[in-house]
């Protein structure tokens, strides 16, 4: 059983097509009752998401930025056999992203966000993307960023309920399911060169 509803409104400022403001909202409800042999898994989730974003430029269109606020709310009524893992999660966040593009051979996107979560506290997630064309048909890309999330360990691994395995959570000092959140630092570097062999692109 699932229900979804969403809304999106925006406004582009008169005589300033590069400047706009948008407001997004979404609500969904999901109710699932499952039996895997002798294992029973029931979950009812209600989620709300709201996002306010403002886009504009700095001096000229080579320098753009986006900033805003968002709010998320998740209520879980989750039962694994006789164990109750129900909880309520909510967070408030603010973000800022700057984009530079010289419309020729270089672009940069740098941003970050600050979130305050009722269980995970306050944390920062930055990110950076760079694209450079040193010569014709050659592209160098560099990226880096940080991510943090709390996994829904049962909902994301439901096929395991069909096995004969038992479930034990060994750590109990974390904030969600007794576990700490997943934290990942991601880095990327690539170079792509297009050329022609025997009049064919390669």
What are these regions (language model features)?
Residues 1-4, 8, 133, 137-139, ...:
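Outer-membrane beta-barrel signature, preferentially recognizing the C-terminal barrel domain
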Residues 2-120, 135, 200-201:
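Face-selective signature of the C-terminal outer-membrane beta-barrel domain
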């Amino acid at each position: 059983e699932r229900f979804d509803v969403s809304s999106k409104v925006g406004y582009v400022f008169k005589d300033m097509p590069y400047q706009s403001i948008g407001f997004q909202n979404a609500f969904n409800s999901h109710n699932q009752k499952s039996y895997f042999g002798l294992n029973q898994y029931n979950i009812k989730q209600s989620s709300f998401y709201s996002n306010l974003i403002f886009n504009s430029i700095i001096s000229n269109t080579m320098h753009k930025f986006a900033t805003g606020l968002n709010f998320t709310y998740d209520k879980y009524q989750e039962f694994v056999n006789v164990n109750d893992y129900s909880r309520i999660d909510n967070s408030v966040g603010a973000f800022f992203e700057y984009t530079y593009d010289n419309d020729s051979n270089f672009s940069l996107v740098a941003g970050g966000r600050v979130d305050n979560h009722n269980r995970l506290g306050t944390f920062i997630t930055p990110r950076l993307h760079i694209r450079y064309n040193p010569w014709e048909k050659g592209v160098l890309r560099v990226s880096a960023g940080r991510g943090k999330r709390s996994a829904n360990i049962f909902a994301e691994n439901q096929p395991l309920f069909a096995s004969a395995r038992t479930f034990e959570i060994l750590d109990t000092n974390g904030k969600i399911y007794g576990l700490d959140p997943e934290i990942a630092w991601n880095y990327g570097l690539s170079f792509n060169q297009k050329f022609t062999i025997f009049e064919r692109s390669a």
